[in-house]
Swiss-Prot record:
Optimum pH is 7-8. The keyword Transport does not apply. The gene is FDC1. It catalyses: (E)-4-coumarate + H(+) = 4-vinylphenol + CO2; (E)-cinnamate + H(+) = styrene + CO2; (E)-ferulate + H(+) = 2-methoxy-4-vinylphenol + CO2. Pfam families: UbiD, UbiD_C, UbiD_N. It is an enzyme of class 4 (lyase). GO terms for molecular function: carboxy-lyase activity; metal ion binding. GO terms for cellular component: cytoplasm. The active site is at 285 (proton donor). Its cofactor is Mn(2+); prenylated FMN. It comes from the Eukaryota. This is Ferulic acid decarboxylase 1. Present with 861 molecules/cell in log phase SD medium. Mn(2+) binds at residues 170, 193, 236.
Length: 503
């Protein structure tokens, strides 16, 4: 029997989830109009198995089933970050800290560019539709939230764009809404790389004929990396190869020269226009809101060809209150880049994380106190240095508050983070504002305020390290069970717990 490779093969990923009892195959007819979304939200919020909708109302034989919650959390007994771990081919019990550190280790590996395979070895080419045969509105595309502006086909697929000189190929995730039978509209915003590449076409007079591909069911490692804010000019495909330890098989598109993962479930291709726009949104996003009737003109994608596998499967993310892919992937992957940036910048940072409970708006940095004291700096100087490093780079684009904590805090435990936050900083006095940096337009307090016109500021660094800790060790007792009593006594209590009468 062939060994499953869930990081490279999307269908192997699904099989692994099934083998681990982390998949519910729903054969009852389900309506893609809100019912799919409702089931997904309940599964996310209860850390339940991923739903595979095999009988969607309005679906044809091969187009399509839906896999929901592909990177949602699951029960701790199964490894709560198991689905994310499987995206990388790691043990399902791998912790999020270990996942972040593994991604950093992979950056030291030799990049492996994709390998071109013949059409006969590309399952995504099983069925091919030309432009006149494409009817996007006939697909069972989910309408995910009440008051969304439309049906969102693209929530967990991968856009592929390439600069005109072909030196930089970008794989990325950005939402996409069906407009009509031939068109999709979606976010193409600065400073995201998809916009930078689109602008490079505009610079040569081709703003309305930018080649694109939109791929679904790509290698899970690829969809994970496409969420990362990696440096400008770096092609994600080579880094994916380093993670996998092998090159991603790719095949040429039907209507342009872009190369797409050969095992993709579905591939839509055509041209993007920055000059032709359509109202996009609103959409229930990563911060947990749909703001009714608040759409915006966005660039238009014209679909000119479509290819797909037998019994194609569409992976779907349904953003909202934590925890879903916009937190588990985007948040943790930004944290990975944040930790690397700290290392490159010489900051005494031990770990970085974006706690899910903060809806991907907070970045927590765990500071090595001995390293901090060696800098002979002040809280004010250090906060400014940290803010200048992060808020002026793409890594800090979605972040609105950076929180500095001491090295006694487990930043992957939100209970400890919020304890440090509320007890170790004085509001305003220990917060340094950065009013000249770019705001994140999707943050609700930006989009629903006058700041939406300037797109500046609303960001700060919060110092949750006691001032004296910048100069010397500062002893205090944490008043909890694990840290507040001698280890021998803690062990004794744990050993005798059932004898005391507890279960």
């Amino acid at each position: 029997m062939r060994k499953l490779n869930p990081a490279l093969e999307f269908r192997d990923f699904i099989q692994v989830l099934k083998d681990e009892d982390d998949l519910i195959e729903i054969t009852e007819e389900i309506d893609p109009n809100l019912e799919v979304g409702a089931i997904m939200r309940k599964a996310y919020e209860s850390h339940l198995p991923a739903p595979l909708f095999k009988n969607l109302k309005g679906a044809s034989k091969d187009l399509f089933s839906i896999l929901g919650c592909p990177a949602g959390l699951r029960s701790k007994e199964k490894g709560d970050h198991g689905r994310i771990a499987h995206h990388l081919g790691l043990d399902p019990k791998t912790t999020i800290k270990e996942i972040i550190d593994y991604l950093l280790e992979c950056k030291e590996k030799e990049p492996l560019p994709p390998i071109t395979v013949p059409v006969s070895s590309a399952p995504c080419k099983t069925h091919i539709l030309s432009e006149e045969k494409i009817h996007l509105q006939s697909l069972p595309t989910p309408y995910l939230h009440v008051s969304d502006g439309g049906k969102y086909l693209q929530t967990y697929g991968m856009w592929i764009l390439q600069t005109p000189d072909k030196k930089w190929t970008n794989w990325s995730i950005a939402r996409g809404m069906v407009v009509d039978d031939k068109h999709i509209t979606g976010l193409v915003i600065k400073p995201q790389h998809i916009r930078q590449i689109a602008d490079s076409w505009a610079a040569i007079g081709k703003a309305n004929e930018i080649p694109f591909a939109l791929c679904f069911g790509v290698p899970p490692a690829a969809i994970l990396v496409s969420s990362m804010p990696i440096p400008e000019g770096v092609s994600e495909s080579d880094y994916v190869g380093a993670i996998l330890g092998e090159s991603v098989p790719v095949v040429k598109c039907e209507t342009n020269d872009l190369m797409v993962p050969a095992t993709s479930e579905m591939v839509f291709e055509g041209t993007l226009s920055l000059t032709d726009t359509h109202l996009e949104g609103p959409f229930g996003e990563m911060h947990g809101y749909v703001f009714k009737s608040q759409g915006h003109p966005c660039p238009l994608y014209t679909v000119k060809a479509m290819s797909y596998r037998d019994n194609a499967i569409l992976p779907v993310s349904n953003p909202g209150l934590c925890t879903d892919e916009t937190h588990t992937l985007i948040g943790s992957l930004v944290a990975t880049e944040a930790k690397e940036l700290a290392i490159e910048s010489g900051l005494p940072i031990l770990d970085a994380f974006m706690p899910y409970e903060a809806q991907a708006l907070w970045l927590i940095l765990k500071v090595d106190l001995k390293g901090l004291q060696a800098l002979k700096t002040t809280p004010e100087e250090f906060c400014k240095k940290v803010g200048d490093i992060y808020f002026r780079t793409k890594v800090g684009f979605i972040v609105h508050e950076i929180i500095l904590v001491a090295d006694d805090i487990d930043i992957f435990n939100f209970k400890e983070v919020i304890w440090a936050y509320v007890t170790r900083h004085t509001p305003v006095a220990d917060q340094m504002a950065f009013d000249d940096v770019t705001s994140f337009p999707l943050a609700p307090f930006v989009s629903q305020s006058s700041r939406s016109k300037t797109m500046k500021g609303g960001k700060c660094v919060t110092n949750c390290i006691f001032r004296q800790q910048y100069e010397r060790s500062f002893d205090y007792i944490t008043c909890n069970f694990e840290k507040g009593y001698p280890k021998g006594l803690v062990d004794k209590v744990n050993e005798n717990w059932k004898r005391y009468g507890y279960k």
